[in-house]
Each structure stands twice: as structure tokens, then as C-alpha cells.
């Protein structure tokens, strides 16, 4: 990341939602909880997101849109924003990765990369 850009840290927690899944019909539902930490000295705003979701068969789905969960949150300096969402896969294992497009107080846009993270039914992977 360019040192002139705000320092943004992304933390992800995932969970398999057994009660909404139906393995017999190849439907595996996962929730993810994301915390966006603004470690910079200025307020930033999340404008849009782009996800690349890949299942174990290599099927890829791109999800793009404004903000997250219907919001374009402003995150103050040294503050954080947490939200949860979910996705369904055709396989018990998959990977998500993506980007957030954000703007700083001067209206300059920058991209925050979201490193790949695993979605997996418990005990499927050793």
C-alpha cells in the first residue's frame, strides 16, 4: 500500500450455517463477519466492494456493488466498522477475496485489497 494512503486493516471471521445449508442439494451457506479498522489519522468512506468467490470446483462468482449491507460507512480515524453478510456455495469448501473502493477526506479514492479467506464446512479439511 502506498504510504500516502490511509492504513486500513481487514479482519475476517467465517462460520458455516448448517441450518440454512442442504448438502444433499449441494447448498452450503456461510456467514462472514468483517471488521474494517481505520488506523490512519483521517476519516475514510467505503464506497463500493468487489468479491471474487471461488468454490472447490473452480466455479467463480463476482459480486460487485455500492457499499456493504446497504451502507457506505464513514470510518473515523482510529475507529472500526463491523458488518456481517453471507454467501452460498455448491461445494463444502471455497475461497473469497476482494477489494473495497474507499475515499479519504480529500475525496481521493484508493483500493483496499481483501486477502483470500477460506469458507469450509467444519471437519471437511484436516
From Swiss-Prot:
<protein>
    <recommendedName>
        <fullName>Protein ApaG</fullName>
    </recommendedName>
</protein>
<dbReference type="Pfam" id="PF04379">
    <property type="entry name" value="DUF525"/>
</dbReference>
<dbReference type="InterPro" id="IPR036767">
    <property type="entry name" value="ApaG_sf"/>
</dbReference>
<feature type="domain" description="ApaG">
    <location>
        <begin position="2"/>
        <end position="126"/>
    </location>
</feature>
<dbReference type="GO" id="GO:0070987">
    <property type="term" value="P:error-free translesion synthesis"/>
</dbReference>
<dbReference type="InterPro" id="IPR023065">
    <property type="entry name" value="Uncharacterised_ApaG"/>
</dbReference>
<dbReference type="InterPro" id="IPR007474">
    <property type="entry name" value="ApaG_domain"/>
</dbReference>
